[in-house]
Amino acid sequence: MAIAITKENIDAKVNKSSLPVILKVHATWCGPCQQMNPIFEELEKEMSSSYLFAELNVDDARDVSIQYGITSVPTLLFIKNGEIVGRETGYMSKDTLIDKINEHLG
């Protein structure tokens, strides 16, 4: 299961991660976010040895959402060594998400 990110743990879990991070920013009321959940979980099972999968609920962590400039959900942030190296917004199929992971973190 993806790590739930909060204001309290973002530095330790995301910024200091030894693995590249795929951070899914979502909301419980967001339909496309809910559609992506099984895809994100499936990829986490397949790729967890290479990437850290994390998620941020915009309603639970508003400060962090503002810090990252989140204006819509779902948004995926690709983070390497504490720096955002890519950002994608909107629903993505599994194949598209794999392509984006390879593009930004591969």
Which stretches of residues belong to each language-model region?
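Proteins that catalyze or organize thiol-disulfide redox chemistry
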Residues: 1-52, 60-63, 67, 73-75, ...
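Conserved acidic residues
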Residues: 57
